[in-house]
Amino acid sequence: MNGAELIIQEINKEAERKIEYILNEARQQAEKIKEEARRNAEAKAEWIIRRAKTQAELEKQRIIANARLEVRRKRLAIQEEIISSVLEEVKRRLETMSEDEYFESVKALLKEAIKELNEKKVRVMSNEKTLGLIASRIEEIKSELGDVSIELGETVDTMGGVIVETEDGRIRIDNTFEARMERFEGEIRSTIAKVLFG
């Protein structure tokens, strides 16, 4: 039995106790009325009991609905907390990559963007560290990418990765770590939701 079912079960028990209490109150009131004026009181007692049952049922439904909303809210909060922690861990790992690992990652991101742009001349933008790394190993990059002219563009505020654009700047592929994480966030959310909540 999961947490949501336990909460709903507890709420059902509480609702049943309230129903019993309301019904007992109604029965006591009905008995007094019967003794005072039996003929008129019977009809009124029935009405009071019906009303009490209706009120009790409405109260039970309200409590259950509120509990379901609370369970859903808590579930979403837990999901958000886990997603945030996963994304923070991804950021931490990206920030602590060795230079060689990072270079391989940058090369892969460059390759992907250049292939998508399908251009022979591109401009690459990134943070200062990444542009310096690309500049220092440009021959290695060119040997892998083939006949592509790479111009180093301006520095941008990013934790890593690259932005690659056509020479005229009309088409741009944002392969920064932040942009990629944003693109995959929906997928990450969906995976976490499946793992946590089935």
Swiss-Prot record:
Assigned keywords, A-Z: ATP synthesis, Cell membrane, Hydrogen ion transport, Ion transport, Membrane, Transport
Keyword Nucleus: no
Primary location group: membrane
Highest taxon in the source lineage: Archaea
Annotated TM spans: none
GO MF term set: ATP binding; proton-transporting ATP synthase activity, rotational mechanism; proton-transporting ATPase activity, rotational mechanism
InterPro entries cross-referenced by the UniProt entry: ATP_synth_B-like_membr_sf (IPR028987), ATPase_E_C (IPR038495), ATPase_V1_Esu (IPR002842)
Compartments in which it is found: Cell membrane
Coiled coil (UniProt feature): none
Transport among keywords: yes
GO biological process per UniProt: proton motive force-driven plasma membrane ATP synthesis
Membrane disposition: Peripheral membrane protein
Cellular component terms (Gene Ontology): plasma membrane; proton-transporting two-sector ATPase complex, catalytic domain
Subunit: Has multiple subunits with at least A(3), B(3), C, D, E, F, H, I and proteolipid K(x).
Family listed: Belongs to the V-ATPase E subunit family.
PANTHER family: ATPASE H+-TRANSPORTING V1 SUBUNIT E1A-RELATED (PTHR45715)
Function comment: Component of the A-type ATP synthase that produces ATP from ADP in the presence of a proton gradient across the membrane.
Alphabetized NCBIfam families for the sequence: PRK03963.1
Protein name, UniProt field: A-type ATP synthase subunit E
Species this chain originates from: Pyrococcus horikoshii (strain ATCC 700860 / DSM 12428 / JCM 9974 / NBRC 100139 / OT-3)
